[in-house]
Amino acid sequence: MGCVSSKQFKRAAQHEDPAILAKETTFSVSEVEALFELFKKISHSIFRDGLIHKEEFQLALFRNSNKKNLFANRIFDLFDLKRNGVIDFGEFVRSLSIFHPETPLGDKIAFAFRLYDLRGTGCIEREELHEMVLALLNESDLFLSEEAVEQIVDQTFKQADLNDDGKIDPDEWKTFASKNPALLKNMTLPYLKDITMVFPSFILNSEVCEEEL
């Protein structure tokens, strides 16, 4: 099969121009092109339609498309900016940009808040935090007693709920997260800064074979 130059990326792949995505995110053009290779692998793992479905997202995270996990579901829902049940390439790049090492801390804090705000009410309630703690433990294959989980929730609210109204608002979350940077360690993926090293340079420089699109 023939090959197309990176200038034909948008037309051939029917995805947004890498230059536009680079301008709107922390990624460079070459990093966006490298992410397209990753996007293709994920979006063709099950349905092969050029879109990432929840099962493919689960498979990429856990090597298991049937594993139920609130954490993975929340990440998928936040990546699905158009709320249509799938993730296209533009959504993939824009959302993944949050995890870039050079993305401002404030953006990471805001994303983490939305992650924990399960009901979308604009605040984090005790039940939501409890559910997310359990999900994160499950994702890490860790087990804590219910009493230990409640202690984590209690301590978090004791430190974060400054006005003691039983919920954590965005400003309280920002203050709490700024004082507890370990809370955001999962909001940074160091390899994204070196994503261009993952794939062959000839792919990044100019060519993507049509048979892979």
Curated annotation (Swiss-Prot):
Entry binding sites for Ca(2+): 161, 163, 165, 167, 172
Domain of life: Eukaryota
GO cellular component: plasma membrane
UniProt tissue specificity: Expressed at low levels in roots, shoots, culms, leaves and young spikelets.
Keyword Calcium tagged: yes
Record site feature (Involved in dimerization), residues: 140
Family label: Belongs to the calcineurin regulatory subunit family.
Protein's UniProt name: Calcineurin B-like protein 8
